């Protein structure tokens, strides 16, 4: 009974965003999925055994994809038409951990977030978060095959739990400078780091933080899960914590999306429950992405479906469908991002990463409008 009351409180808080979801839903747009790389043979165009449970994916303005391989502790590079094109990058671990578990990653175009090794110092080209509670930077001029540890919060304790669990990563700028934002799923906050990798603030949605569907102990609440910078604002997904606050608990309606400014102020509740099911990947579609052009797309890890929302109102518009009118469902869906018009593919093609078969395997692929 107590759990039911807590759930009702959450629903009441987000009642207004929920109403237009059903009323505004459209039939999903038609799209074609193409499997590009997998760790398994005969599953995609190319095979790469390093691609196990890939999460985040990012690219430079004209470069290839950088993909975080959670299952192998690596980051691998792919173009839109080929398998790995450069040596894999090893993500560092904290003490006592054998293999890193990278999650979100971002491309860094700034001169900040400098890393150093053997008297060589350069700004990170790519930055990686991990479930081990670390953040690392990579620049081939510092080390061609290893990222450099910059943040280690693996031993930090809070509310009876030890070790940050970073699920997502975003980079955003404000008048105060350039900052990294990491979703710490274990502690239920978004952590903000300055240009020198110093932790300067943390924030969350106080409504969700004070309403936990499973009272515990320990209490299981909705915590920041995925994160993406869209139009200079931070879009943050929330998923339900498991008992040890490490993994999500999937299920229909288990998800929210909020929008924050770079100072951590909640701007609005963007999307709530409905078709959300442990949402993680987020992207803003371009003007030539078919039915869902210019809309925000959010991928569910829980059921592999991709939801589309009006970018202004957050109204649910439908889910991406294949040519037969069936909802596209990608088992273990994680990252979503559009190409760059260069080595990372067409700008109107949505690329994805997924850890299918309960995260035991990996898939990197593309979805384009028919």
Each PLM stretch: what is its role?
Residues 1-11:
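Bacterial N-terminal signal peptides that target proteins for export
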Residues 9-20:
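Bacterial N-terminal signal peptides
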Residues 21-25:
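Signal peptide processing junction and immediate N-terminal pro/mature segment
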Residues 26-370:
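Sequence/structural signature of beta-propeller domains
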